[in-house]
Design a protein with these regions (language model features):
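Short linear sequence elements within intrinsically disordered, low-complexity coil regions
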Residues: 11, 40, 45, 86-88, ...
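Catalytic core of non-heme Fe(II) oxygenases with the double-stranded beta-helix
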Residues: 100-265
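Short, flexible segments with low predicted structural confidence
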Residues: 17-21, 91-92, 138-140
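Short, functionally important structural connectors and interaction interfaces within domains
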Residues: 14, 24-27, 32, 153, ...
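Short, mixed-charge, low-aromatic patches
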Residues: 2-9, 74-78, 129-133, 211-213
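Residue-level marker of intrinsically disordered, low-complexity segments enriched
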Residues: 2, 66-69, 242, 256
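Non-heme Fe(II)/2-oxoglutarate
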Residues: 24-124
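Fe(II)/2-oxoglutarate
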Residues: 1-30, 266
Length: 266
């Protein structure tokens, strides 16, 4: 990886630090495989994440980006309060200008290195093999294309997400928390919440959003700088974001999703 920020050896060291954090994380298996780990990114990287955060006009809303479909395109929809830059799409990454672009281009290449991607999948290998009916972990790469997607997110004011299992094309999701209002810890949970359906055994294959009233919240991740919350996508991986009622709140984070698609071997 060629860059003007860090030497090759430093970059490889950053990869190893992240892999160490992920592989040694303690997975909780109920109600679906997930974990939370502190201080995920190397110190040198998280400092630059904050220093080189893109300007507001370089983000676009979920509705404008096309990330949300089958909804009325109105500003009252919750997706209007989530702004994003898809770092793995050249056109969106190019919205970032100057020195900021240099860093985020480096950051994207760092987090999508083959070793990092394999570690992100390996931690959930048993669940992935069970879901896809694979005999061993290597079969995943033999039979499927693996596609990482990194979305830099800025949630504002009234943003919330109802319980959902997520896009069925995803294998795993990693949420890296960067920054929020200084006193957010005094209010409602800011991190992603885990839910169990009131209706015993209820599952959802499509990943549509459901009402909070139909679920019990059993856990909320701590929204703290450099915390990572991750889960393996299943038909009961219900998660969401609680709406903060007391005052306007902002959150800055990265959503790292790994998608899969069957290889065409013809």
């Amino acid at each position: 990886m060629t860059n003007i920020l860090f030497a090759h050896k430093e970059t490889k060291g950053f990869e190893k630090q992240m892999i160490y954090k992920v592989i040694n994380s303690n997975i909780k298996h109920f109600p679906f495989p997930h974990f939370e780990t502190e201080e995920f990114l190397p110190k040198e990287i998280i400092e630059k994440v904050i220093a080189f955060w893109p300007s507001s006009n370089e983000f676009i809303s979920n509705l404008e980006s096309g990330s949300i479909v089958n909804v009325d395109l109105n500003k009252a929809h919750q997706a209007s309060f989530r702004y994003q830059i898809n770092l793995t799409t050249k056109e969106e990454l190019a919205r970032i200008s100057g020195e900021n672009f240099i860093f985020w281009d480096y950051f994207t290449k760092l987090l999508t290195s083959p070793e990092v991607i394999v570690s992100f999948l390996n931690i959930f290998s048993k669940s992935i093999m069970s879901r896809l009916g694979l005999k061993d972990f290597n079969s995943l790469f033999d039979n499927y294309n693996i596609m990482p997607k990194l979305q830099l997110l800025h949630d504002r004011t009234n943003y919330f997400l109802g319980p959902h299992t997520d896009n069925p094309g995803k294998l795993v999701v990693f949420l890296i928390y960067f920054d929020s209002d200084e006193d957010s810890g005094k209010s409602n949970p800011m991190g992603t919440s885990v839910y169990v359906p009131v209706k015993e055994g209820f599952k959802c294959e499509k990943g549509v959003h459901h009402k909070h009233d139909d679920f019990f919240k059993v856990f909320s991740a701590t929204f703290k700088k450099n915390n990572i919350f991750s889960f393996c996508r299943t038909n009961n991986s219900f998660h969401g974001v609680e709406k903060v009622q007391e005052r306007p709140i902002e959150r800055k984070l990265l959503q790292y999703s790994i998608y899969y698609g069957l290889k065409n071997k013809s």
